[in-house]
């Protein structure tokens, strides 16, 4: 013991002594270094927690359980007692601190091999806890509560103070919000699978070095995202596809979530087996081989192999059929057996010619079967790549066509915007003549794809009493054609110009009243779909996606923040249509101003342009 370390307190039985070295402090506890005088070791820590005597009595059953927990990947709980106003307990000391502190020190982040090793140890500890009857739920799994011995890469689960045995479902809300499963916030209760959800968040932190939901500024935002099953932003920065798949498996709903033991058997955490030669007879024909799974709890598989009558492919297929081996190991173990046979043949010397031919034939047969299998896999991969390229080319063509049509539509609308206000200006009516000549009407020319204003309309004499209705009809035709183009553009092109154009058109076609907060979302979506010329199928799709987000009334829709709109899952066109429909009062004022202009009100040209936009 160094000179600066001194004993400041001893346990009631005299076995443990508390030193003056403080290892950590929390809101309710202080952790000191301690010595075990019976074992003569100082790799223990003593923790003082402020509790009442009654609370300590209530913890008696849990303390007895924690004392009985013994596993290489769980910090050992030695003893506990009540000391006046404090609950004191002795646990094993981990030299390198928490896993979170260790990850922060690493530059760059740990590689996949190290992450796999950590995951296996954490899952083994969880599988042990969940394997009790009834299961023990930790309820606060996070990298801050997982400890490491950096010299050996040893991982252990600690801070078992929140652990509890499960008889049926639990309802107590306890833990860290970023690592708490959605069911912990609900009234239906939860089980040991909340630890699997928290493990998924730990795996995410190991892979990215980022704290889950780091984009949130408070616990309320975290709660909202968790209950809406919105995953952390750092999930998009996971590079390894298999690791990403494993994280998503851990974050699935409770009834779909795998157990700790099942995740241990996932291919991402699987250790490649190795085939070793255990023994051989004098003739080198009868061999005893063994499949060894290093770093896993699986038992080794030992089997006999006759070099004269057996082939590697047949023996491995037989073991898979008898469920001794998993199918995913077939190719690897077959190659390993063939490697051992080649080594024996090379060291044995030149065999008889007949036997040599048999061995060569068997080896060639095995190689041919492996090549055929590889060819099939390659052909399938090439076919998938070809199909993906075709889809990409088709999407590019659709995007080009949609962009061209959108540009033409914008040009046509600009033409209409600058020509129609001149036609809408009130003109003096011509004096009646004895034999009036028919006034030439404005001419409009219909192009193959869009309707444009004919140049003649700008030079025609002053409009008659039917001119306003003709111009209105022309504008309606342009809006109708634009809506048709936007149906395809809604699914393929979402440029800034296109979105702004949709908003301007929708603002002129919206219903002219405000909706009350208790208006049903079905009624609101039906009006929006009707105003934008959308089909009933589109209406149902919009309503379904809103209701999936628990948006049942117009009031729920108004309560959404800007960042919440993007999480609904609708297209940009649909979101803008819904937002315009919410602004019904503004649209009504705009429409009344436009009607006043057409009936002869003296509105300036600039105001008319603003109304049309």
Curated annotation (Swiss-Prot):
Provide the catalytic activity annotation: L-seryl-[protein] + ATP = O-phospho-L-seryl-[protein] + ADP + H(+); L-threonyl-[protein] + ATP = O-phospho-L-threonyl-[protein] + ADP + H(+)
Question: Which spans does this entry mark as compositional bias, Polar residues?
Answer: 592-602
- Give all residue intervals belonging to the Protein kinase domain: 17-269
Residue spans of biased composition, Low complexity class: 442-475
Question: Which residues make up the binding site for ATP?
Answer: 23-31, 50
Specify residue ranges for compositional bias: Pro residues. 427-441
Q: Where is this region: Disordered?
A: 424-475, 589-613
Q: Which GO terms describe its molecular function?
A: ATP binding; protein serine kinase activity; protein serine/threonine kinase activity
Enzyme class name? transferase
Instruction: Tell me which UniProt keywords the record has, alphabetically.
Output: ATP-binding, Kinase, Nucleotide-binding, Serine/threonine-protein kinase, Transferase
Catalytic-site annotation from UniProt: 140
**What EC number(s) is this enzyme filed under?**
2.7.11.1
Q: Which Gene3D superfamilies match?
A: Phosphatidylinositol 3-kinase Catalytic Subunit, Chain A, domain 1 (3.10.20.90), Phosphorylase Kinase, domain 1 (3.30.200.20), Transferase(Phosphotransferase) domain 1 (1.10.510.10)
Its family remark reads: Belongs to the protein kinase superfamily. Ser/Thr protein kinase family.
Biological role: Serine/threonine protein kinase that probably participates as an intermediate in an intracellular system controlling nuclear proliferation.
The identity of this protein, by name, is: Serine/threonine-protein kinase pkpA
Q: Which organism is it from?
A: Phycomyces blakesleeanus (strain ATCC 8743b / DSM 1359 / FGSC 10004 / NBRC 33097 / NRRL 1555)
């Amino acid at each position: 013991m160094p000179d600066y370390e001194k004993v400041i307190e001893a346990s009631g039985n005299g076995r443990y002594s508390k030193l003056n070295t403080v290892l950590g402090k929390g809101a309710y506890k202080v952790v000191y270094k301690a010595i075990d005088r019976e074992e003569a070791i100082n790799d223990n820590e003593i923790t003082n927690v402020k509790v009442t005597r009654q609370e300590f009595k209530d913890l008696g059953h849990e303390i007895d359980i924690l004392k009985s927990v013994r596993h290489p990947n769980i910090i050992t709980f030695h003893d506990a007692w009540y000391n006046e106003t404090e609950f004191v307990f002795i646990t094993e000391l981990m030299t390198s601190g928490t896993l979170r502190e260790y990850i922060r020190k690493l530059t760059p982040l740990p590689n996949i091999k190290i992450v796999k090793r950590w995951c296996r140890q954490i899952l083994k500890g969880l599988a042990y806890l969940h394997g009790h009857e009834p299961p023990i739920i930790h309820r606060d799994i996070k990298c801050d509560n997982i400890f490491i011995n950096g010299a050996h890469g040893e991982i252990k689960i600690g801070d078992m103070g929140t652990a509890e045995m499960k008889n049926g479902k639990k309802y107590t809300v306890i833990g860290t919000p970023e690592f708490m499963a959605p069911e912990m916030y609900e009234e239906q209760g939860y089980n040991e699978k909340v630890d699997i959800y928290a493990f998924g968040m730990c795996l995410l932190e190991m892979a990215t070095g980022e704290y889950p939901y780091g984009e949130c500024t408070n616990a309320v935002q975290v709660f909202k995202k968790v209950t809406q099953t919105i995953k952390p932003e750092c999930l998009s920065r996971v590079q390894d596809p298999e690791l990403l798949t494993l994280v998503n498996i851990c974050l699935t709903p409770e009834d779909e979530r795998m157990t700790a033991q099942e995740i241990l058997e996932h291919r991402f955490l699987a250790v490649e087996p190795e085939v070793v030669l255990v023994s051989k007879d004098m003739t080198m024909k009868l061999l005893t081989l063994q499949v060894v799974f290093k770093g896993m709890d699986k038992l080794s598989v030992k089997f006999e192999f006759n070099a004269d009558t057996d082939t590697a492919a047949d023996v491995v297929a037989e073991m898979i059929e008898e469920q001794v081996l998993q199918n995913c190991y077939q190719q690897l173990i077959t190659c390993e057996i063939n490697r051992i046979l080649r080594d024996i043949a090379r060291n044995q010397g030149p065999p008889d010619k007949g036997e040599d031919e048999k061995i060569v034939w068997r080896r060639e047969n095995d190689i041919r079967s492996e090549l055929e299998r590889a060819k099939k896999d390659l052909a399938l991969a090439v076919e998938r790549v070809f199909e993906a390229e075709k889809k990409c080319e088709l999407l590019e063509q659709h995007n080009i066509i949609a962009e061209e049509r959108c540009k033409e539509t914008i040009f046509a609308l600009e033409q209409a915007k600058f020509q129609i206000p001149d036609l809408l200006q009130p003109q003096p009516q011509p004096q009646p003549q004895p034999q009036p000549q028919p006034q030439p009407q404005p001419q409009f020319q219909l192009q193959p794809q869009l309707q444009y204003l004919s140049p003649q309309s700008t030079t025609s004499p002053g409009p008659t009493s039917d001119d306003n209705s003709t111009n209105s009809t022309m504008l309606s035709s342009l809006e109708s054609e634009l809506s048709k183009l936007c149906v395809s553009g809604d699914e393929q092109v979402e440029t800034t110009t296109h979105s702004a154009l949709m908003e301007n058109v929708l603002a002129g076609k919206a219903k002219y009243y405000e909706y009350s907060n208790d208006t049903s979302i079905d009624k609101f979506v039906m009006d929006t779909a009707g105003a934008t010329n959308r089909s009933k199928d589109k209406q149902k799709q919009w309503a379904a996606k809103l209701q999936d987000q628990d948006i049942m009334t117009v009031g729920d829709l108004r309560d959404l923040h800007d960042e919440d709109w993007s999480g609904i899952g609708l297209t940009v066109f649909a979101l803008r249509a819904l937002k315009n429909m919410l602004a019904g009062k503004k649209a009504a004022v705009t429409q009344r101003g436009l009607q006043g202009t057409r009936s002869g009100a003296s509105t300036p040209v600039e105001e008319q342009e603003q109304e049309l936009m």
